From Swiss-Prot:
Keyword Secreted: yes
Signal peptide: 1-20
Residues of the propeptide: 71-79, 98-113
MF terms (GO), sorted A to Z: receptor ligand activity; substance K receptor binding; substance P receptor binding
Record-given protein name: Tachykinin-4
Keywords: Amidation, Cleavage on pair of basic residues, Hypotensive agent, Secreted, Signal
Similarity remark: Belongs to the tachykinin family.
Modification Leucine amide occurs at: 95
GO biological process: detection of temperature stimulus involved in sensory perception of pain; inflammatory response; negative regulation of sensory perception of pain; negative regulation of systemic arterial blood pressure; positive regulation of cytosolic calcium ion concentration; positive regulation of flagellated sperm motility; regulation of blood pressure; regulation of sensory perception of pain
Tissue expr: Expressed at low levels in the uterus of both pregnant and non-pregnant women. Isoform 1 is found only in the adrenal gland and fetal liver. Isoform 2 is found in heart, liver, bone marrow, prostate, adrenal gland and testis. Isoform 3 and isoform 4 are expressed predominantly in adrenal gland and placenta.
Length: 113
């Protein structure tokens, strides 16, 4: 709320200076212009930081959600546990993941033909 108020105040000042020219020609000057400095209160800092953290987390979840990665240490999709008879041993080779049981069955099927 406070940053919005400061931004609104700065916008009003710029509109007032442009409207107050009265058609005079603007020239560049080396004189110092009036600046408005707004100091944030000590209590306002953590709430702004919390809002920024929420925005960052939201962007990260959108990005990593597309890639199937975990955000914040929790999996997006909870995998179901496999029962003992459904477990298969897999290994990572140059051609990708392979199942030991599936390859063995294919070899047996080809050998019996």
């Amino acid at each position: 709320m406070l940053p919005c108020l400061a931004l609104l105040l700065l916008m009003e000042l710029s509109v007032c200076t442009v409207a107050g020219d009265g058609g005079e020609e603007q020239t560049l000057s080396t004189e110092a212009e009036t600046w408005v400095i707004v100091a944030l209160e000590e209590g306002a800092g953590p709430s702004i930081q919390l809002q920024l953290q929420e925005v960052k987390t939201g962007k990260a979840s959108q990005f990593f959600g597309l890639m199937g990665k975990r955000v914040g240490g929790r999996p997006l999709i909870q995998p179901r546990r496999k029962k003992a008879y459904q477990l298969e041993h897999t290994f990572q080779g140059l051609l990708g993941k392979r199942s030991l049981f599936t390859e063995g069955r294919e070899d047996e099927a080809q050998g019996s033909e």
